[in-house]
Structures are given as structure tokens and as C-alpha cells.
């Protein structure tokens, strides 16, 4: 009996110490992290293996992200289709919200993130279904081609093809071709910003609103304060960014293009109104803020929301993710509904 008491006491002490140590991880040089987010950040920091952009690592990364995401909500209808542009077959998934509105609905092109090398338009449906229902919009999610197998401009070309398809087929989908929104997170935010620029420059379909969530807007410069502050400590590692940039855009000269680095565009006037959301613990934070400020300076109506305490993608924080989803849904609804 005495041995059992000692054993239980030892185990309890070890658990208390472990909890205390892990709780200390919530205190960082950049401020407090929520406990689950702190665990995510610390586990990522301990993983010092360089990112490998292979099909095998892509499958592992996709599965890891799905584990942190809640399930989507039920919608009126979800349908898979495929569009063909310039001989390329591009899978899309269409989401119709539950609504009593008899008229045509706004339509929104969703562009997934994943560093241009992982993810797809269908695997993580919670944000998509939430936005479709709460903004009362039809959403088309595009499964664009990924690097390194398909470097720039493949992904952007696929997104542009999806935008043109949406405009041409909106009425058949029950949508209004004059009320098109676009958006995406991280690499998807980069592609959405680039898509808005390209549509403006090439006289493409008119976009009424763009939602840029934790976007990468500058694939050239690395002297951002948020790069130095975050380093490799907060889930998205600065050391991995250059690998992803080089995989997506192998030619360094192409990285100066506004369709790759929207922040480097000389003229941002005439772009659609925007919502830009950044995360405090994200190395991409400052370039997202800089892009929002440049949009405002160019006369583009722009909302900027900087989410305190959030990691890139808001992993480890359902509360922050829910708040961001609510802000996005309200902004999209207001912009696309007359």
C-alpha cells in the first residue's frame, strides 16, 4: 500500500510539472497564446525537419490540418463538377446555402490555402460551408493545380478559368453574374489578390468584393518585422516560406510580378473593395497589413482586422476561428447583397 501511495504521488507530481511547463508555453515574447495554440506552436517548433514538398508529405500535411478543423455544416446542396480550360481539367465543388430567397444569389469563388503545394478545395469544408450559409451565397471552390508539379502560373490560370466559368454559368447555378466575390486564405489569399489584379488588367469578369485571409502578398522581400519576431516558433516557419515560394515560382524574376507579389504592384486603384484579416503570431502579418494600407491609399474601400493571439490559420483556437468566420460572413453578405 505504501508503494502504491508513493507511485501515485510521483505520477501526480510529474503530471503537475508537465502541465505547469506546458502552461508556461502560453507566455511568449509576442504576448499570450491560448493553451491549445501554444501546444501546436511548441510541437511545430520542436519539429526541425525541413519541409519536403513531395506527394507523401502533402498527404501527411493535409491529414494533419484536417485533424484541427471542425466539421462543416449541412447545406441545401453540394455538387462536384469539372471545368476544362486550355485543355486542363479543373475540379470544382459548388455549395448552395439553405435559403428561402427565390431570386438569384451572389456567387463567391473560394481559393484554398496550403502554400501552393498542399490542400485542395474540398478537404476542409467548415469555413466554406459556414460562409455559404451565413453570407447566403453560392460558393464555388476550385481545386487548382499545385506546385512543384505545376509551378506558376498554373494555379492562377486555374483560378482565372474558374472565375470566367462562374461568370458564364452563374444563371444556370441560380446566381447573379453581377455579384461575384472572391477570397482565400494564405496562399489562397495571395491568389485571390492576384486574381483581382489580373481581372482588372485584362478586362475580366467584374469582381464586387475580395476577402484576403492571412495573405502572402510579397514573395520577394524577407525583411519584415513579423518574420524576425515569429522565426520558426509559431507553426508557420519562416524557414519554410522560401522553400514554398521557390517551389511555386522557380524563376526569381517572376516573383516581382504583381500577379505573384500583389504588394509590389505599382497601381492598386480600381480594385474591388476588400476585407483583409491578419493574425498576430503569423510571419505574414506585416505584409498583409501593408497590402491593406496600400489598398486604402489607392482609394479602395478596405476593412482591416488584425486578430490578436492568433497563429497562422488560427490553429489551436476555435474561438478565434469562429470570430474570424463571423467577421468574414458579415462582410461578404454586406458587400454582395444589395
Model regions and ranges:
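Alpha/beta-hydrolase superfamily serine-hydrolase fold, recognizing
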Residues: 18-60, 64-338
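N-terminal Sec-pathway targeting helices
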Residues: 1-16
Amino acid at each position: 500500500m505504501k508503494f502504491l501511495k508513493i507511485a501515485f504521488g510521483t505520477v501526480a507530481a510529474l503530471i503537475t510539472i508537465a502541465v505547469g511547463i506546458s502552461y508556461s508555453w502560453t507566455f511568449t515574447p509576442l504576448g499570450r497564446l491560448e493553451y491549445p495554440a501554444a501546444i501546436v506552436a511548441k510541437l511545430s517548433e520542436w519539429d526541425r525537419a525541413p519541409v519536403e514538398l513531395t506527394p507523401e508529405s502533402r498527404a501527411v500535411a493535409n491529414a494533419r490540418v484536417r485533424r484541427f478543423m471542425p466539421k462543416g455544416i449541412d447545406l441545401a446542396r453540394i455538387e462536384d463538377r469539372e471545368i476544362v480550360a486550355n485543355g486542363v481539367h479543373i475540379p470544382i465543388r459548388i455549395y448552395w446555402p439553405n435559403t428561402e430567397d427565390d431570386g438569384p444569389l451572389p456567387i463567391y469563388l473560394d481559393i484554398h490555402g496550403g502554400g501552393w503545394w498542399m490542400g485542395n478545395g474540398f478537404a476542409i469544408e467548415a469555413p466554406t460551408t459556414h460562409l455559404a450559409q451565413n453570407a447566403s451565397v453560392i460558393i464555388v471552390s476550385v481545386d487548382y493545380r499545385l506546385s512543384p508539379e505545376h509551378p506558376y502560373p498554373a494555379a492562377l490560370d486555374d483560378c482565372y478559368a474558374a472565375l470566367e466559368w462562374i461568370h458564364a454559368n452563374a444563371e444556370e447555378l441560380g446566381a447573379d453574374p453581377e455579384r461575384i466575390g472572391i477570397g482565400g486564405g494564405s496562399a489562397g489569399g495571395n491568389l485571390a489578390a492576384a486574381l483581382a489584379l489580373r481581372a482588372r488588367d485584362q478586362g475580366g469578369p467584374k469582381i464586387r468584393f475580395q476577402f484576403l485571409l492571412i495573405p502572402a502578398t510579397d514573395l520577394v522581400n524577407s525583411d519584415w518585422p513579423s518574420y524576425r519576431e515569429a522565426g520558426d516558433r509559431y507553426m508557420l516557419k519562416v524557414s519554410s516560406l522560401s522553400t514554398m515560394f521557390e517551389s511555386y515560382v522557380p524563376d526569381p524574376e517572376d516573383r516581382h510580378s504583381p500577379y505573384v507579389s500583389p504588394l509590389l504592384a505599382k497601381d492598386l486603384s480600381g480594385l474591388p473593395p476588400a476585407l483583409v484579416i491578419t493574425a498576430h503570431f503569423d510571419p505574414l502579418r506585416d505584409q498583409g497589413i501593408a497590402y491593406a494600407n496600400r489598398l486604402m491609399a489607392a482609394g479602395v474601400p478596405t476593412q482591416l482586422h488584425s486578430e490578436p493571439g492568433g497563429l497562422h490559420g488560427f490553429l489551436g483556437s476555435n474561438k478565434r476561428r469562429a470570430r474570424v468566420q463571423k467577421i468574414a460572413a458579415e462582410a461578404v453578405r454586406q458587400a454582395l447583397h444589395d
